[in-house]
Swiss-Prot record:
DNA-binding region: 118-209
Keywords assigned by UniProt, alphabetized: Activator, Chromatin regulator, Developmental protein, Differentiation, DNA-binding, Nucleus, Spermatogenesis, Transcription, Transcription regulation
Family matches, as InterPro entries: FH_FOXA3, Fork-head_N, Fork_head_dom, FOX_domain-containing, TF_fork_head_CS_1, TF_fork_head_CS_2, WH-like_DNA-bd_sf, WH_DNA-bd_sf
Tissue specificity statement from the Swiss-Prot or TrEMBL entry: Restricted mainly to endoderm-derived tissues (lung, liver, stomach, and small intestine), also present additionally in ovary, testis, heart, and adipose tissue, but missing from lung.
Organism: Mus musculus (Mouse)
Subcellular location: Nucleus
Matches recorded under PROSITE patterns: FORK_HEAD_1 (PS00657), FORK_HEAD_2 (PS00658), FORK_HEAD_3 (PS50039)
Name used for this protein in its record: Hepatocyte nuclear factor 3-gamma
UniProt feature, compositional bias: Low complexity: 226-254
Gene this protein is translated from: Foxa3
Disruption-associated phenotype: Reduced expression levels of several HNF3 target genes (phosphoenolpyruvate carboxykinase, transferrin, tyrosine aminotransferase) by 50 to 70%,. The germinal epithelium of testes is characterized by a loss of germ cells secondary to an increase in germ cell apoptosis that ultimately leads to a Sertoli cell-only syndrome. Significantly lower blood glucose in fasted mice.
Gene3D superfamilies recorded: Winged helix-like DNA-binding domain superfamily/Winged helix DNA-binding domain
A single cellular component GO annotation: nucleus
Length: 353
């Protein structure tokens, strides 16, 4: 009994001296994960905290393992890692970031000009209008306008020459500003500048950020429009008169003057003119006369042109007439109607063709 007991104890001692193969860790295999390790622990087998060597190593401890201390600082953005990461008994690898990480965006911003020194969103006309309206007498000199703008907006305290030139141009070229001479009781240098009485609706509801319309004096606009219209009318009138003169010269050529050696042609002209000028007297003569279809009377024509074909043909076929011309162009009713019929027949034939 005792021997067997001793042998069992001896066996236990041998088993404790010779560990099993599954519990021996060689330095070649990577370290398995068995407990919540720190995030800074490397898994490289060459830097394993276990001693190399083999069979004489003891079994793994059951408690948490402490990571080795970092060899180099991690950077300036993690100032709190020295205190949080040096404790070996921490079970979690999370470290709260420093105050610089929470507000890093604000720290990364560059320098910004304060709002008071920014350029105001007003035009020069708006600035001048504000300065004049804030004055007790509703008028200011040029230097007083400069001073008011610089006192209210610090942006205009720099580059004074540039924006002051713009102020002077705005005062001179805008009709909404009126130059007022100094009175004898207010001696000094420079005239006053005031707003035109009719420029009250220049801004929308008193908002100087946007101007409603450009103010212009109606008198200047009317004068400019009248001068332009007068010049246009003068040019058009001269062109019209020249055109009328040329048309008159073309449409009214010089009429030939009859010579004393042509009494027959002159009498023929008179007869043709009388015939053409008296169409109403032709109706009673031919009311009861039946004429062929080719010689029917046409509508009365008024050929008064000296070079018309009727007058030219009447000059060739005319015969000496004995008509009395004392009835004011109506023809002689008591004369012989042969010549009158002859001239009328020739005119009807020409019209029928």
């Amino acid at each position: 009994m005792l021997g067997s007991v001793k042998m069992e104890a001896h066996d236990l001692a041998e088993w404790s001296y010779y560990p099993e193969a599954g519990e021996v860790y060689s330095p070649v295999n990577p370290v398995p994960t068995m407990a919540p390790l720190n995030s800074y622990m490397t898994l490289n087998p060459l830097s394993s905290p276990y001693p190399p060597g083999g069979l004489q190593a003891s079994p793994l401890p059951t408690g948490p393992l402490a990571p080795p201390a970092p060899t180099a600082p991690l950077g300036p953005t993690f100032p709190s890692l020295g205190t949080g990461g040096s404790t070996g008994g921490s079970a979690s690898g999370y470290v709260a970031p420093g105050p610089g990480l929470v507000h890093g965006k604000e720290m990364a911003k560059g320098y910004r000009r304060p709002l008071a020194h920014a350029k105001p969103p007003y035009s020069y006309i708006s600035l001048i209008t504000m300065a004049i309206q804030q004055a007790p007498g509703k008028m200011l000199t040029l230097s007083e306008i400069y001073q008011w703008i610089m006192d209210l907006f610090p942006y205009y305290r720099e580059n004074q020459q540039r924006w002051q030139n713009s102020i002077r141009h705005s005062l001179s070229f805008n009709d909404c500003f009126v130059k007022v001479a100094r009175s004898p009781d207010k001696p000094g240098k420079g005239s006053y500048w005031a707003l035109h009485p009719s420029s009250g609706n220049m801004f929308e509801n008193g908002c100087y950020l946007r101007r409603q319309k450009r103010f212009k004096l109606e008198e200047k606009a009317k004068k400019g429009n009248s001068a332009t219209s007068a010049s246009r009318n003068g040019t058009a009138g001269s062109a019209t008169s020249a055109t009328t003169t040329a048309a008159t010269a073309v449409t009214s050529p010089a009429q030939p003057q009859p010579t004393p050696s042509e009494p027959e042609a002159q009498s023929g002209d008179d007869v043709g003119g009388l015939d053409c000028a008296s169409p109403p007297s032709s109706t009673p003569y031919f009311s009861g006369l039946e004429l062929p279809g080719e010689l029917k009377l046409d509508a009365p024509y008024n050929f008064n042109h000296p070079f018309s074909i009727n007058n030219l043909m009447s000059e060739q076929t005319s015969t000496p007439s004995k008509l009395d011309v004392g009835f004011g162009g109506y023809g002689a009713e008591s004369g012989e109607p042969g010549v009158y019929y002859q001239s009328l027949y020739s005119r009807s034939l020409l019209n029928a063709s």
